[in-house]
Amino acid sequence: MSKNKLSKGQERRVQANHQRRLKRTDNKPELDDSQLGEPQDGIVISRFGMHADVEAADGTQHRCNIRRTLRSLVTGDRVVWRPGVGTHAGVKGIVEAVHERTSVLNRPDIYDGVKPIAANIDQIVIVSAILPELSLNMIDRYLVACETLEVEPLIVLNKIDLLDAEARKTVDGMMDIYRHIGYRVLEVSSQTREGMEAFEQALADRISIFAGQSGVGKSSLLNALLPPSDKQILVNQVSDVSGLGQHTTTAARLYHFQHGGDVIDSPGVREFGLWHLEPEQVTQAYVEFRDYLGGCKFRDCRHDTDPGCAIRGAMEKGDIAKERFENYHRILESMASVKVRKNFTDAAG
């Protein structure tokens, strides 16, 4: 007797259930109270399934089991853990509780919803570069994410050494768009170290996460900032001619900068999906729009070609950058497109 073919959505759910059963039957070592020391505070350096690397107050790192009652644990979480008496199959302790987060960075996934990928972030470093391409649209997307998450952004333009004087002047003008609306912008080079001292100062005493497209030099910057003992973030071979790199990071991990501050390097922030946001949230995330909200002729103004739009009027007078205004509508269009695909996928499942 023939069986009906499973839809893609059903196949995903079957596979997910199978993986959950595998985890439940995993014979990982368990530590009871007699094998555990006193509770102490620590920070999650990295997460691996039902294990986490936890850094203790003295700087030592310990591979720990995670209590099954802890549903969400990510890099950057401040936790209560108990060291084991000895080592059991490579496990040195157990994470028992998670302190309240000051912030959480979520990654929207078209299939699995919104997932946390890092916690207690103080700032998001938006790394862009003049090669492979300086994309103001991508910077604006990251800024929307930062404003929505209420995490302070820092815009860093890398590979500035590849510009001649005329091109440098043009790029400075583009970056002034962001300086004029209150964002911090640094222009740096990991090769010549131009701007790196100011960058180090901006990173001190904070937990940062680097965001940016592949090839903008995130890993090169991190390696320039990390102490020699921690240079585990590798960059694929880079052409001296093109100056282009490739994304190589594979797992979220917290590192300590040699001049102070920490970074969580995660593959989950190559791009921020914004499809889970409402259009009103994107509008609010444009800081220069806020003074004009409520000033439009119509309450349901889309801030496009609507008559009496205060935001478009401000753009036409030069009070709002045309580039930012156009990217605002590109973001809304891309969000609508992804939502259509997601709704189609959900219906197919």
Swiss-Prot record:
Which cofactors does it use? Zn(2+)
Q: Which residues bind GTP?
A: N158, K159, I160, D161, G212, Q213, S214, G215, V216, G217, K218, S219, S220
From the Swiss-Prot or TrEMBL record, what is one GO molecular function term?
Answer: GTP binding
Q: Where does Zn(2+) bind?
A: C296, C301, H303, C309
Extract the PANTHER family matched here.
SMALL RIBOSOMAL SUBUNIT BIOGENESIS GTPASE RSGA, SMALL RIBOSOMAL SUBUNIT BIOGENESIS GTPASE RSGA 1, MITOCHONDRIAL-RELATED
Q: What is this protein called?
A: Small ribosomal subunit biogenesis GTPase RsgA
Q: Where is the protein situated, by its record's location annotation? A: Cytoplasm
Enumerate the residue ranges of region (Disordered). 1-38
E.C. number: 3.6.1.-
Highest taxon listed in the record's lineage: Bacteria
Function of the protein: One of several proteins that assist in the late maturation steps of the functional core of the 30S ribosomal subunit. Helps release RbfA from mature subunits. May play a role in the assembly of ribosomal proteins into the subunit. Circularly permuted GTPase that catalyzes slow GTP hydrolysis, GTPase activity is stimulated by the 30S ribosomal subunit.
The record's similarity note reads:
Belongs to the TRAFAC class YlqF/YawG GTPase family. RsgA subfamily.
Binding partners and assembly? Monomer. Associates with 30S ribosomal subunit, binds 16S rRNA.
Q: Where is the CP-type G domain?
A: 102-272
Q: Which GO terms describe its cellular component?
A: cytoplasm
Entries under SUPFAM superfamilies matching the protein: P-loop containing nucleoside triphosphate hydrolases (SSF52540)
Could you mention a single GO BP entry for this protein? ribosomal small subunit biogenesis
What intrachain disulfides are recorded? none
| Upper classification of the organism | Bacteria, Pseudomonadati, Pseudomonadota, Gammaproteobacteria, Enterobacterales
Q: Which HAMAP family match?
A: GTPase_RsgA (MF_01820)
